[in-house]
Amino acid sequence: MAETVHSPIVTYASMLSLLAFCPPFVILLWYTMVHQDGSVTQTFGFFWENGVQGLINIWPRPTLIAWKIIFCYGAFEAILQLLLPGKRVEGPISPAGNRPVYKANGLAAYFVTLATYLGLWWFGIFNPAIVYDHLGEIFSALIFGSFIFCVLLYIKGHVAPSSSDSGSCGNLIIDFYWGMELYPRIGKSFDIKVFTNCRFGMMSWAVLAVTYCIKQYEINGKVSDSMLVNTILMLVYVTKFFWWEAGYWNTMDIAHDRAGFYICWGCLVWVPSVYTSPGMYLVNHPVELGTQLAIYILVAGILCIYINYDCDRQRQEFRRTNGKCLVWGRAPSKIVASYTTTSGETKTSLLLTSGWWGLARHFHYVPEILSAFFWTVPALFDNFLAYFYVIFLTLLLFDRAKRDDDRCRSKYGKYWKLYCEKVKYRIIPGIY
């Protein structure tokens, strides 16, 4: 269970604030970008005149077509997750001493999804621009539907947990927000967090990136170079994610954060709306960068995505070989750390202190943030709202780095202190 580091009042207030304000923010972001020319000032003026009633008036009502799109997409991804073949992959040992098993078929599902989506458009069966035209209704349906989904997860955690990595802290708000189960499943093979985080959330990022590109083409008869750079970089990033999906199952999202509002609602709603927002902005705000500048941005973005990937690959290879590998051409520097599981077993982990992981404890967040900047900067600087995702991601990753440090300090004790003495900086070498 996630530990709280603030007073109970601050903890509850922050959770309730996110529960209350994240849903309307999604609608406000969409409304401002699509209907107010991306101008926060115009949106502020609208609410200055109309007050709370203005939010009620602009909030799209979920329509049948929105529900159909969500259901067809979700069902398609669930079927691919279940039926596509994939390598058997074991996740890390859980706090209760369990080791989850996955089927790594994400990359195949990704290519099948994009090929199907583009094929439906190419042969005139389905126009992806329809998704953009009903985007507000889709986001509205996702907001309410995902909230109900999280309620069902909360109930499942109480009455039918999938493993011993579950339980209540005794507080409804915390249980609902952080979740009851670490690895909730339907049956033995359908992992709910893999579905929400990877197959619905991350897959929607690629699908919507393509959608925005097609919509701009429908409006203007061409696709601007800024949109091309944005779309290519987003697709490269998501392709990297699914190529490395088995590694993602070792991260905090899967291995430490339980399935509650924070993770599941975030992946089902926040990822499709906020993470894709630079592309959403560019639909109606095309920018011609010129070939030279577009290539510079594209190359810089791809380089950052590669460095981010190589950081994760380096650590994954180090763990896979139990430290018997080369890191930047040399034997890796490491710390052998022991810890005790909640069931009382003593385990050991290897902490890598060289390569990318010798620069800072979470250096991989630097190229991650820069990647987001490079697929956003094609929008230039007329409206700062296009950069909301970059700002949000920076705050999220800095907070995640602190939470991970706190968790590892509690888990490894003196070994983590030694690790921090060897790798002094948390994220930015020489600065922080």
UniProtKB/Swiss-Prot annotation:
Q: Where in the cell is it found?
A: Endoplasmic reticulum membrane
Q: Which reaction does it catalyse?
A: cholesterol + NADP(+) = 7-dehydrocholesterol + NADPH + H(+)
Which parts pass through the membrane? 12-34, 64-86, 107-126, 136-155, 195-212, 227-249, 261-283, 287-309, 371-393
Q: Recall the GO molecular function terms of this protein's record.
A: 7-dehydrocholesterol reductase activity
Keyword line: Cholesterol biosynthesis, Cholesterol metabolism, Endoplasmic reticulum, Lipid biosynthesis, Lipid metabolism, Membrane, NADP, Oxidoreductase, Steroid biosynthesis, Steroid metabolism, Sterol biosynthesis, Sterol metabolism, Transmembrane, Transmembrane helix
Q: What is its EC number?
A: 1.3.1.21
Could you tell me the superkingdom of the organism this chain comes from?
Eukaryota
Listed pathway(s)? Lipid metabolism; steroid biosynthesis
Name any GO cellular component annotation.
nucleus
Q: What class of enzyme is it?
A: oxidoreductase
Membrane topology note: Multi-pass membrane protein
Q: Per its UniProt record, what PANTHER family does this chain match?
A: 7-DEHYDROCHOLESTEROL REDUCTASE (PTHR21257:SF38), DELTA(14)-STEROL REDUCTASE (PTHR21257)
Function per UniProt: Production of cholesterol by reduction of C7-C8 double bond of 7-dehydrocholesterol (7-DHC). Lesions in the gene coding for the enzyme cause dwarfism.
The entry's family comment says:
Belongs to the ERG4/ERG24 family.
* Record protein name field: 7-dehydrocholesterol reductase
Q: Gene that codes for this?
A: DWF5
